[in-house]
Regions:
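Membrane-proximal, proline-rich intrinsically disordered regions
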Residues: 22-74, 99
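Primarily recognizes Gram-negative and organellar outer-membrane beta-barrels
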Residues: 74-77, 105
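Bacterial Sec-dependent N-terminal signal peptides
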Residues: 1-30
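Short, compositionally biased low-complexity segments
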Residues: 22-29, 89-93, 162
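Short, well-structured active-site flanking segments
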Residues: 29, 156-167
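Conserved, well-structured interaction surfaces
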Residues: 47, 55-59, 84-159, 173-176
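Terminal processing/anchoring signals of secreted or surface-associated proteins
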Residues: 1, 22-24, 53, 120, ...
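Short linear capping/connector segments at secondary-structure termini
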Residues: 32-35, 97-99, 166-174
Length: 177
């Protein structure tokens, strides 16, 4: 009986504390906030921004099996390999030249390159506004523009004419996407 009363009191106290919270949000003033431009005006951080663009090339949808399938298996430079019952997602279609635009390898290559282009456009947006050493700034901008050209080269090589995006876009703007 005593445990039941204690348990009931515990439940009532818990409900009281949970239901009697503040109604207003806690507003905290940022004292040491660093803007993105302050952060990037440090040369080491600007280099890290460009390294983030290079890093995109390590993603699975850049130069992995989807890319090999589109460039080597379809041209007979390579075979799907394995056993006939192992489809390798859509690689058996590429090996037989019966693939379609909705196959996963095509969307991987397409999405991977445009994700890289998105990164390059964001990097260029910030790099062009920085106040770092002009030689370093020009080098970083040239590296990022090269990577964007490489991504477009891959897209044109696989798909022909593609939409060209050369400025930073707001991914929340549904009209652009």
């Amino acid at each position: 009986m005593k445990t039941r009363i204690n348990f009931s009191l515990f439940i009532i106290a818990t409900c009281f504390f949970l239901l009697s919270s503040c109604e207003d949000d806690l507003d905290v003033e940022l004292r040491d906030a660093v803007t993105e431009f302050d952060f990037l005006n440090n040369p080491d951080n600007a280099i890290q921004l460009v390294n983030g663009v290079y890093n995109k090339q390590l993603d699975y949808n850049m130069y992995s099996f989807s890319w090999i399938g589109m460039t080597s298996i379809t041209s007979d430079d390579a075979d799907k390999g394995s056993t006939p019952s192992d489809t390798g997602s859509d690689k058996h279609k590429m090996d037989n030249l019966t693939f379609g635009a909705s196959d996963i390898s095509f969307s991987d290559v397409w999405n991977g390159r445009y994700e890289g282009i998105y990164r390059t456009n964001n990097a260029l947006f910030y790099l062009e506004q920085l106040t770092i050493d002009s030689a370093l700034k020009n080098r970083l901008i040239a590296e990022v523009k090269f990577l964007r050209a490489l991504f477009y080269f891959d897209l044109v090589r696989c798909f022909g004419g593609v939409p060209v995006v050369t400025s930073k876009i707001d991914i929340n703007n549904t009209e652009l996407i």
